[in-house]
């Protein structure tokens, strides 16, 4: 008996909100209340479902892990916010440099 297996390529949109808060918290190894605090501080902006449920993307989970890493290194949330802003700005500048050659 031969079994034919086909490879299916699945591209996942890393910005699509798919994880409810409990799942995102588990993936990031955090308590759901921590995610709510980070949202209130503006560190994370999850998408919302039509019923206003928070939906976190893979990129959001990665950002939560980065926040956790920075706080473990001793930064407070104001410091974390500053570092994330500077990292975003650096990516923008690198993108501009790549575009202009």
Question: What would you call each of these model-derived segments?
Answer:
Residues 1-20, 26, 40, 45-46, ...:
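Arg/Lys-rich, alpha-helical DNA-contact motif
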Residues 31-34:
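Short coil turns linking two alpha-helices in DNA-binding domains
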